[in-house]
From Swiss-Prot:
<keyword id="KW-0963">Cytoplasm</keyword>
<dbReference type="InterPro" id="IPR027409">
    <property type="entry name" value="GroEL-like_apical_dom_sf"/>
</dbReference>
<feature type="binding site">
    <location>
        <begin position="86"/>
        <end position="90"/>
    </location>
    <ligand>
        <name>ATP</name>
    </ligand>
</feature>
<feature type="binding site">
    <location>
        <position position="412"/>
    </location>
    <ligand>
        <name>ATP</name>
    </ligand>
</feature>
<keyword id="KW-0143">Chaperone</keyword>
<keyword id="KW-0067">ATP-binding</keyword>
<dbReference type="InterPro" id="IPR001844">
    <property type="entry name" value="Cpn60/GroEL"/>
</dbReference>
<keyword id="KW-0413">Isomerase</keyword>
<dbReference type="GO" id="GO:0042026">
    <property type="term" value="P:protein refolding"/>
</dbReference>
<comment type="function">
    <text>Together with its co-chaperonin GroES, plays an essential role in assisting protein folding. The GroEL-GroES system forms a nano-cage that allows encapsulation of the non-native substrate proteins and provides a physical environment optimized to promote and accelerate protein folding.</text>
</comment>
<dbReference type="GO" id="GO:0005737">
    <property type="term" value="C:cytoplasm"/>
</dbReference>
<dbReference type="InterPro" id="IPR027410">
    <property type="entry name" value="TCP-1-like_intermed_sf"/>
</dbReference>
<dbReference type="Pfam" id="PF00118">
    <property type="entry name" value="Cpn60_TCP1"/>
</dbReference>
<dbReference type="InterPro" id="IPR002423">
    <property type="entry name" value="Cpn60/GroEL/TCP-1"/>
</dbReference>
<comment type="subunit">
    <text>Forms a cylinder of 14 subunits composed of two heptameric rings stacked back-to-back. Interacts with the co-chaperonin GroES.</text>
</comment>
<dbReference type="GO" id="GO:0051082">
    <property type="term" value="F:unfolded protein binding"/>
</dbReference>
<keyword id="KW-0547">Nucleotide-binding</keyword>
Amino acid sequence: MSKKILYGKEARKALLQGVDAIANTVKVTLGPKGRNVILEKAYESPAIVNDGVSIAKEIELKNPYQNMGAKLVYEVASKTNDKAGDGTTTATVLAQSMIHRGFDAIDAGANPVLVKEGIELASLTVAKKLLAKSKKVDDQEDIQNVASVSSGSQEIGKIIAQAMQKVGKDGVINVDESKGFETELEVVEGLQYDKGYASPYFVSDRESMTVHLENALVLVTDHKISTVQEIVPILEEVVKASRPLLIVAEAVENEVLGVLVANKLRGTFNVVVTNAPGFGDNQKEMLKDIAVLTKANFVFKDLNMKLADLKMDDLGNINKVIIKKDNTTLISNSKSPELEKRIQLLKTQIKNSTSDYETKNLQERLAKLSGGVALIKVGAATDTELKDKKLRIEDALNATKAAITEGIVVGGGKALVEVYQELKDTLVSDNKEVQQGIDLVVQSLLVPTYQIAYNAGFSGKDVVKQQLLQPSNFGFNAKEGKYVCLLKEGIIDPTKVTRQAVINAASISALMITTEAAVVSFKENKDNNFDLGTQE
């Protein structure tokens, strides 16, 4: 296929149009009075969402140059979501500002490599300043405030705080759908282990890249499944039972995986494979934990148990399975005496353990088995509302976990304003062009505050001016339209979310400003002219 190349200012202009297409769409959602964006969905009703990365993911532009710019900004949102679980809109707004300022500097004759050096220096300094300002999450109130700010709902904040109180800060919390209109919290028996699906082709929900199984059978073994013939007899029984099957094995050969995936895609049976968690003796014990929870017979190779001899009675049962890329959650609705015995055995082993390493592993297993799983059952009047509510709760959960990891900073964009005030005259370089890179990052720190105020119906410029005059921790409450002590009002952000937003925005901006050419594929129309399309 032929290629078309744009150079210099022309290339940067096209990329910038793509950046603006995404950023201008996403930034309307920022802050407590941010608006929603409606997304067309093929074969289903439109989605109305407030989540930056979900919006950015859906945007495809006809012009390939503009689309490259858009996809680079989507990467900012996606990376921030992967690392911190929230803050995607803030990252997008920061990236747009940095890229605009960076391109202006390059077009005015600055050396892009030196400007890039300044951007990298400034972003690392901002990240350090944010960590220095971070306050540890000490109590339930902080957890509730973080979740409330992220979701834009006091009710959701309260439910997430209750969930963490019941299963612990490191406990397993999942979001599910309720059959009613109310959003409720339920704690059930279950555990989560750190292995996801063995192949992405098992995924049933492409949007969230998750597998959901209901009323599933469970095969638990420390065998390496090398041939399909080993498990054909039990698979035939599973097909007759018309129930989904979860296979948890030490390993499964690619050839076997291929056959299982092909049969799943054809609809022959519904099966998902995950590798066993842990390694060595600890792996065997974790597999036993899974077997006890699911009431499965553990197919143990040291006892010369063979997969070919498996009967239906050897398989376990589980009410619900949620499998993601990196973890699997098993949820049971019934209490088991065997599970209680297993928990007591672990407690005894911890008491008698003389090894720190062994004690740590035992404590982790005990926490997984005894902590249970908190289910936030989301209720709504319509499917559209349900999807939006689930996204908000998932974002709030991620934000809360990020806050527990790195602590919190004052919210409403104030933390970035304070860092701006500390660095605007102190972070200096002898090189003029490096300084331009520093300045464009530092100046961009004011943009989230501007956008939050603008979305709430206030003058962004006036609010930024007033923010600069406020004492530490005091700032603009966009929801109420007044200046308050933000910490006292519970307007806080996870440090990790804010820090990752700055780092990822600066990373893409630094790379984009060094771009001097853009290469795309093109189709020729009937007149043999280039068909590159226009922005759509």
